[in-house]
């Protein structure tokens, strides 16, 4: 079953909604996630997915989308290198799926991010490890976050005082990243909720 990049995005959104809420998204919710102007565009992609057997359509229901059982077991998407400026869950970033279920972590994980570099080594997050990430912007001082500063995505410990945010490495060789929210753009992609060691993947 070969899907276009956009169809894969729609399928990932459906899986995420089912994992998080227990039911699939509406057409309007899919359209909003992907920036479509109307639910009709989402409907077209859903029909294409149904033709390819990736989903089943249930007529007459706003959430009438069903995932075949085999499709529900793909697990969490593994996000590799994130291209500057593009959404972290964009299809081109997904390099694999891991069969761990989201509920293995608390709060539940939405995806696994492959860690680059050794800036968090002192708390055991090493280059090549997978960081389980819960998608949220509601984070607190001291938590490990995935943050986008400008066009770069980084994993750091979060600290905020007023309009100043510090993204702090757990490695004395790396200086904190200081962000003045009055002048710079900062977006929190999610909260780190667990680590899968690179060595555990083999």
UniProtKB/Swiss-Prot annotation:
Q: Which residues bind DNA?
A: 27-47
**E.C. no:** 3.4.21.88
The active site annotation covers 119, 156
Could you name the domain of life of the organism this protein comes from?
A: Bacteria
Keyword list, A-Z: Autocatalytic cleavage, DNA damage, DNA repair, DNA replication, DNA-binding, Hydrolase, Repressor, SOS response, Transcription, Transcription regulation
| The keyword DNA repair is annotated on this UniProt entry | yes
Task: List the Gene3D superfamilies.
Answer: Umud Fragment, subunit A (2.10.109.10), Winged helix-like DNA-binding domain superfamily/Winged helix DNA-binding domain (1.10.10.10)
Biological process (GO), any one: SOS response
Reaction it catalyzes:
Hydrolysis of Ala-|-Gly bond in repressor LexA
The molecular function GO annotations come to: DNA binding; serine-type endopeptidase activity
Q: Does the keyword Nucleotide-binding apply?
A: no
Q: Which InterPro entries match?
A: LexA, LexA-like, LexA/Signal_pep-like_sf, LexA_DNA-bd_dom, LexA_repressor, Peptidase_S24_LexA, Peptidase_S24_S26A/B/C, WH-like_DNA-bd_sf
Pfam families, per database record: LexA_DNA_bind, Peptidase_S24
Q: Please indicate which residues carry the site annotation Cleavage.
A: 84-85
Q: Which NCBIfam families match?
A: lexA
The family classification in the record reads:
Belongs to the peptidase S24 family.
What this protein is reported to do is described as: Represses a number of genes involved in the response to DNA damage (SOS response), including recA and lexA. In the presence of single-stranded DNA, RecA interacts with LexA causing an autocatalytic cleavage which disrupts the DNA-binding part of LexA, leading to derepression of the SOS regulon and eventually DNA repair.
HAMAP family tied to this protein: LexA
Under the subunit heading, UniProt states:
Homodimer.
Query: Which protein is depicted?
Result: LexA repressor
Q: What organism does the UniProt record list as the source?
A: Marinobacter nauticus (strain ATCC 700491 / DSM 11845 / VT8)
């Amino acid at each position: 079953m070969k899907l276009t990049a956009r169809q894969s995005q729609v399928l990932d959104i459906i899986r995420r909604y089912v994992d998080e809420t227990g039911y699939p998204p509406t057409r309007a919710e899919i359209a909003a996630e992907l920036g479509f102007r109307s639910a009709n565009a989402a409907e077209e992609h859903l029909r294409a997915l149904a033709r390819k057997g990736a989903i089943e359509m249930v007529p007459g229901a706003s959430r009438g989308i069903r995932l075949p059982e085999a499709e529900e077991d793909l697990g969490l998407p593994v996000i590799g290198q994130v291209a500057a400026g593009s959404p972290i869950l964009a299809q081109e970033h997904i390099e694999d799926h891991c069969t761990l279920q989201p509920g293995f972590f608390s709060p539940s994980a939405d995806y696994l991010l492959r860690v680059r570099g050794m800036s968090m080594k002192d708390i055991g997050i090493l280059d090549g490890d997978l960081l389980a990430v819960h998608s949220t912007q509601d984070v607190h001082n001291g938590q490990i976050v995935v943050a986008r500063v400008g066009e770069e995505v980084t994993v750091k410990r979060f600290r905020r005082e007023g309009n100043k945010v510090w993204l702090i490495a757990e490695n004395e060789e790396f200086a904190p990243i200081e962000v003045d929210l009055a002048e710079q753009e900062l977006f929190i992609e999610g909260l780190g909720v667990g680590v899968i060691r690179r060595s555990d993947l083999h």
